Amino acid sequence: MIIKYDANIKDESIAANLKRITNQIYKLLPNREEGSDWEKPLSTLLEEIAGMDRLLIGSHEILFPLLCKLEGLFLLTQEEDFFLFRRTIFECLGLTSQLAKNIYG
């Protein structure tokens, strides 16, 4: 796949990165449930996805809502917010799946 700067990146490399990001998004759930740090990994994910948004031309329609939903997780810190947190995680996983389909067909 040709990305910004005319760099030709192998589809396998992008697929592996998307799989890793998907796993990291999913891991936010048990981290929060167990009282582990979930905010620092979330910040790292946001940084990576923002960078991906700058590199993957034509994927902004998916990456922007993904960034918005992940950023919104920082607001869901109360115990009663957990089900919304969980639902948002699964919506984000759906967006990463949609992104993979758009890239690979």
Residue ranges of predicted features:
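Short intrinsically disordered terminal tails
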Residues: 1, 42, 102-105
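Generic preference for well-ordered secondary structure
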Residues: 1-5, 9, 50, 54-57, ...
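Amphipathic alpha-helical binding modules
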Residues: 68-105
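Short terminal alpha-helical segments
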Residues: 1-39, 93, 97-98
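Amphipathic alpha-helical interaction modules
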Residues: 23-69
